[in-house]
Curated annotation (Swiss-Prot):
The modification N6-carboxylysine is found at K100. Pathway: Pyrimidine metabolism; UMP biosynthesis via de novo pathway; (S)-dihydroorotate from bicarbonate: step 3/3. This is Dihydroorotase. Pfam families: Amidohydro_1. Zn(2+) 1 binds at H14, H16, K100, D248. Its cofactor is Zn(2+). Zn(2+) 2 binds at K100, H137, H175. Belongs to the metallo-dependent hydrolases superfamily. DHOase family. Class II DHOase subfamily. Homodimer. The gene is pyrC.
Length: 348
């Protein structure tokens, strides 16, 4: 087995960069590995129109490391009031690539999200007309629904209906966490795809809960049981172009995670491709990593694959205990642990 792995440079089709003083840190981490990234719009206030998307894009570009060509692909945050005109303006901008459906209350900064999917059917119809993907956080949010069942219920109550009603709409079922979602995407038409995170390939709920609660494993959708983890590994390593890389890297300051009511999100951008390599290696499927990380996403979005490459080397290194995060610190996933693959820096 080779100790070096060279891939076409990957893209991240789902990431949270946050805003303000933390941008130089989060943008620097993603730009180290990825050429492009789909930027989540759940700021406070959210990115609801092309003007706000353009302003956020400029802040991200200004935070890039010197010499970086990293390209942020902006996303519109859908609300009950998003109009077809908002969608058409976003498409015409040339820098907004998708629109995001957050069910209200589903995750961090989603309070402005959609209260009923029926409210945004005119906007979804416009998305289908202009060829812009709908990105879906697929969880129901009613309090009586068990947190481990919310993804499956969303499929049954909403996803099937949306896919059937808008047969030409490109839909990305984001950060899928269940065998139900993997099966749904596999059986759906070619215009339905899904992203999968590194943490959902490497871990299950036992890692978060057994022997004590580990807040840095807590994300939404929440880690599920091992059988779902296995199904996600099957999907990611299958070579099926419907499945592609989306880290959902979502930083929170240490005090916001290590709290009585901690925030949801795992910070993986600093070593994401290294973690994916571990997951694929566990399945003896490193030959499938380039498709998942570098080819399937661009093909789904109708974009060219990158032409430059990255190289991973099989070399143990210890992840940092913490990383700078503006004036605070963030504890990354795998903090203080050994990783088996290392990205070979260009000047190394």
């Amino acid at each position: 087995m080779s100790d070096r792995l060279t891939l076409l440079r990957p893209d991240d089709w789902h990431i949270h960069l946050r805003d303000g003083a933390v941008l130089p840190h989060t943008v620097g981490d993603v730009a180290r590995t990825f050429a492009r990234a789909i930027i989540m719009p759940n700021l406070v206030p959210p990115v609801r129109n092309v003007t706000e998307a353009g302003a956020y894009r400029e802040r991200i570009l200004a935070a890039r490391p010197a010499g970086s060509r990293f390209e942020p692909l902006m996303v519109l945050y859908l609300t009950d009031r998003t109009s077809p005109e908002d969608v058409r303006a976003a498409k015409a901008s040339g820098f907004v690539y998708a629109a995001k459906l957050y069910p209200a209350g589903a995750t961090t900064n989603s309070d402005s999200g959609v209260t009923s999917i029926d409210n945004i059917f005119p906007a979804i119809e416009a998305l289908a007309e202009v060829g812009m993907p709908l990105l879906v956080h697929g969880e129901v949010t009613r309090s009586e629904i068990d947190v481990f069942d919310r993804e499956k219920r969303f499929i049954d109550e909403h996803m099937r209906r949306v896919v059937e009603r808008f047969p030409t709409l490109k839909v990305v079922f984001e950060h899928i966490t269940t065998s139900d979602a993997a099966q749904f995407v596999t059986e759906a038409p070619a215009n339905v795809g899904a992203t999968i995170t590194a943490q959902h390939l490497l871990y299950n709920r036992n890692h978060m809960l057994v022997g004590g609660i580990r807040p840095h494993f807590y994300c939404l959708p929440i880690l599920k049981r091992n059988t779902h983890q296995v199904a996600l590994l099957d999907a990611a390593t299958s070579g099926n172009p419907k499945f592609f890389l989306g880290t959902d890297s979502a930083p929170h300051a240490r005090h916001a995670k290590e709290a009585a009511c901690g925030c949801a999100g795992c910070y993986t951008a600093y070593a994401a491709i290294e973690m994916y390599a571990e997951a694929f290696e566990q399945r003896n499927a490193l030959d499938k990593l380039e498709g998942f990380a570098s080819l399937h996403g661009p093909a789904f979005y109708g974009l060219p694959a990158n032409t430059d490459t990255i190289t991973l080397v099989r070399e143990e290194w210890t992840a940092p205990e913490s990383l700078p995060f503006g004036e605070q610190t963030v504890v990354p996933l795998r903090a203080g642990e050994k990783l088996r693959w290392r990205l070979l820096e260009k000047n190394a």
